[in-house]
Regions:
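Loop-centered beta-sheet repeat module
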Residues: 160-206
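Conserved CoA-thioester-binding segment of acyl-CoA-metabolizing enzymes
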Residues: 1-60, 99
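Hydrophobic, secondary-structure "cap" segments at the distal end of domains
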Residues: 154-163, 245
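Glycine- (often His-adjacent) and acidic-residue-rich active-site loop
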Residues: 61-96, 144-146
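Gly/Pro- and small hydrophobic-enriched strand-loop and loop-to-helix capping segments
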Residues: 127-150, 184-199
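Amphipathic alpha-helical blocks and their helix-capping loop/short-beta junctions
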Residues: 191-252
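Hydrophobic/aromatic residues within transmembrane alpha-helices
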Residues: 59, 71, 123-124, 179-180
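Glycine-rich beta-to-alpha active-site loop
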Residues: 101-145, 167-177
């Protein structure tokens, strides 16, 4: 797992029995995914996949964000400098990492206790277990930048109920933890004060059996109530508007 100091600092690794915990560590940038972070995460995922002593991966963020997305500022800087190859290399590694996570041979638990947007979704939503909390805030805000939801969003958004995924992708609508659970972006909802106990239980279990892991998470999870003004309550109306074919009506 050789890497530069910069890459190592941006992803902290804890070894707890058969569990490996990857902690995103760019707190000043809300853990935005950088080229160095992408390289390090990809290296770690590939190494752990081949390590028979590793049974479970836990991914979380340090500070108040899980991951606020890709490091757009660095990408813009490279483009202005004419460093298109750097941008292409970053994107290639990032999308490769998304694929590795989506096809990973070992269970992965993403603890989404805070902001999870854009590339942050790519490093978490493709995993088997996604835990939302009362602090979770999800969005795919790329459309506001003149882009489109990437990092595999065309896969996971298209599988949300009705046309809710299209709505989230088109509008960049922000979802809280309860909405993430309701629409399927999260598999579980756990109050943040229970997360340390959950981690300890997962470590103590020493298991790679998805049913065992799901059962453990279930012991700490709950089904929260949606807000009265939640966009998810309007999913039936969104479906009717999409059928009519009016994009402005569908988006508002």
């Amino acid at each position: 797992m050789a890497s530069t100091n910069g890459e190592t600092d941006q992803v902290l690794v804890e070894e707890k029995s058969s569990v490996r915990i990857f902690k995103l560590n760019r707190t000043k940038q809300l853990n935005a995914i950088s080229a160095a972070m992408t390289s390090r995460l990809l290296e770690l995922f590939l190494a752990c996949a081949e390590d028979s002593s590793v049974k479970l991966i836990i991914v979380k963020g340090k500070g108040r964000a899980f991951c606020a997305g890709g490091d757009v500022a660095a990408v813009v800087r490279d483009i202005k400098r004419g460093s298109w190859k750097s941008v292409a290399d970053f994107s290639r590694k990032e999308y490769t990492m998304n694929y590795v996570i989506a096809t990973y041979s070992k269970p992965m638990v993403s603890i989404l206790n805070g902001i999870v947007m854009g590339a942050g979704a790519g490093v978490s939503i493709h995993g088997r277990f996604r835990i939302a909390t009362e602090n979770s805030l999800f969005a795919m805000p790329e459309t506001a930048l003149g882009l489109f939801p990437d990092n595999g969003a065309s896969y996971f958004l298209s599988r949300l109920p009705g046309f809710f995924g299209e709505y989230v992708g088109l509008t960049g609508s922000r979802l809280d933890g309860a909405e993430m659970l309701a629409c399927g972006l999260a598999t579980h909802f756990v109050q943040s004060n229970k997360l340390p106990m959950l981690e300890e239980a997962l470590i103590k279990a020493n298991s790679s059996d998805p049913s065992v892991i799901s059962s453990i998470i279930g012991e700490f999870s709950q089904i929260p109530n949606l807000k009265k003004n939640s966009a998810y309550h309007r999913r039936g109306r969104l479906q009717r508007r999409k059928t009519i074919g009016s994009l402005p009506q569908f988006s508002h």
